[in-house]
Amino acid sequence: MEETTSEVVEEYLLEIYILNQAGEKVKANKLATALNSKPSTVFATLQRMKRDDLVKLNRSKEITLTAKGSGLADNIAYRHNLAEYFLCNSLKIPWFEVHMHAHKLEHAMTPLVVEKLAEFLGQPQFCPHGTPMPGQSLP
């Protein structure tokens, strides 16, 4: 049986992933600001994520993704970028407008839909913003 992750946890994983990709150290207050959430809500969610082996918190309260959390975050980022690619290249929505639409789609895509959409789109290697697709090994 496939384990499911809530949309809230997916949001946290993706935001931590994005901040890490930008080379930023992630702490709860930065995450609260980025997610427009109360620090107490962020703390409670991070505790659940820690319990579920998705994140680690070191002594300086820096948040990092575990291997499990990183794998899930890669998958979420891939779904998001794939949705952006579809919206921009197939539906001709301007690249600067696709983010919020893709954000909604990323949570609704099943593994089968992701697989078939990637095939339909020719296995894109870059999102419309020029970022390599997560998990792609490029030459």
Language model region names:
Residues 106-139:
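C-terminal regulatory/oligomerization modules of transcriptional regulators
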Residues 46-47:
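Short, hydrophobic-biased segments on the C-terminal half of alpha helices
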Residues 61-80:
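Basic, amphipathic "hinge/linker" alpha-helix immediately C-terminal to the N-terminal HTH DNA-binding motif
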Residues 1-36:
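Extreme N-terminal segment that seeds HTH/winged-HTH DNA-binding domains in transcriptional regulators
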Residues 40, 96:
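Key DNA-contact positions within bacterial/archaeal DNA-binding proteins
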Residues 50-58:
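A short, conserved structural fragment
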